A protein has these predicted regions:
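Asp-box/BNR beta-propeller blade signature and adjacent active/binding-site loops
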Residues: 4-375
Length: 375
């Protein structure tokens, strides 16, 4: 009798392990989105103003996220010497007409101490405002290797971002619990949970959604795309069951934003297709103001991130309506970059947008529907 080959035993063991992990995910009904809030026109006339969130406290500042909690905008971002450096930390600030002084709320040392494991670096944060008033913060950390070996950590605040709980590590993958990253905001579900867009960079670049209950139990994990060139999905729902996702494209030119659709609240997604929107391998942000149109912030370029624009449209037709930042000079000793937008809508009807300004600062724009509709 021939012995069983080692590779067969290895594959069988992996299959059993993966199957057991899948069984640990609770059985649940299909998700249902909370319907988008209908925000009436303010009838105040056009309003637009700009503010600095960060002011060169660190050499670089990047990957901001914004959320509204109890009517107050709160922003987070990471800053330090440069992306991936050991001194990079997560910072937070809140807005009440002006932005408060940035506060460091997490770094590799505090994360390492809380998790009891070595942390090499931290990165991308994203905020989520729970319906019960909690403010959640997801951010990535790496123990060994690059971003492809990331894990997601979670903290929360009960006082509009003034104080935060110690981080916990979410278990999102059966394979060493690595290669899951966040960038964009989650969507609220009718059962109180959240559908969090995530992506992977290990053995490819592809997008997923992670469905979490209000107590952070992993309820489901759904693949959005496959392959090596689609990441950082930005998702918004159109009603209780349908949603659109726009994905950053990192493949061969021409660079275009990828789009996907779901008709069952993210239980299944269509095959990604290229839109007509340019994408220079850069993140986008999408929201549904609830007025019959969608709003998208993007770098509408095939190369470079020196222009940041707003587009209005529907599922498959988009029009650039505003150019927010643009630098056309070519004789500079550096490249300008206005990138990684994050948008949200307040109960007062104002749209808030934060983004990386030239890799050095975080900038905030506040505007209303009337300003968007100006020619």
């Amino acid at each position: 009798m021939n012995p069983v080959p080692k590779i067969t035993l290895t594959i069988a063991s992996a299959a059993v392990f993966f199957g057991c992990w899948i069984l640990l995910i609770p059985v649940r009904q299909l998700p249902v989105y909370l319907p988008p809030a209908v925000i009436p026109a303010q009838q105040k006339g056009p309003v637009f103003d700009a503010h600095w969130v960060s002011n060169n406290e660190t050499n670089e500042a990047h990957s901001a996220s914004i959320a509204i909690t109890d009517g107050k905008p709160v922003a987070v971002w990471y800053g330090g010497t440069e992306e991936g450096h050991r001194d990079v930390a997560i910072f937070s600030s809140s807005f009440d007409g002006t932005w408060s002084s940035p506060r460091m709320i997490a770094d590799r040392n505090s994360t390492e101490q809380a998790l009891g494991r070595y942390i090499r670096k931290v990165g991308n944060p994203t905020l989520y405002s729970w319906p019960d008033g909690r403010l959640g913060l997801y951010y990535v950390s790496v123990s060994i290797g690059g971003w492809a070996a990331s894990s997601i950590n979670y903290m929360e605040s009960f006082d509009q971002g003034m104080q935060w709980t110690s981080p916990i590590r979410l278990v999102t993958s059966p394979f060493l619990n690595i290669s899951t990253l966040v960038r964009t905001k989650g969507l609220p579900l009718s059962d109180g949970g959240v559908q969090l867009p995530v992506y992977h960079e290990f053995l490819g670049k592809f997008s997923e959604t992670l469905t979490l209950s209000s107590d952070l139990t992993v309820m489901d994990k759904v693949r959005i795309s496959r392959g090596k060139h689609s990441l950082q999905p930005a998702i918004t729902n159109l009603d209780e069951s349908s949603a659109i996702g726009l994905l950053r494209y990192s493949g061969d030119p021409p660079g275009r934003v990828l789009s996907v659709f779901s008709q069952d609240a993210g239980a299944h997604w269509s095959t990604p297709v290229r839109t007509e929107l340019p994408n220079p391998d850069s993140a986008v942000s999408i929201i549904n103001p609830g007025n019959g149109y969608l709003l998208l912030a993007l770098n509408d370029l095939e190369d470079g991130r020196h222009r940041l624009s707003l587009a209005m449209g529907s599922e498959d037709e988009w029009t650039i309506v505003k150019v927010l930042e643009e630098e056309t000079a070519t004789n500079l000793d550096h490249e300008y970059e206005f990138s990684y937008p994050s948008m949200t809508i307040g109960p007062d009807g104002f749209i808030h947008l934060v983004y990386t300004w030239n890799q050095k600062r975080i900038k905030h724009l506040r505007f209303n529907r009337e300003w968007l509709e100006l020619p």
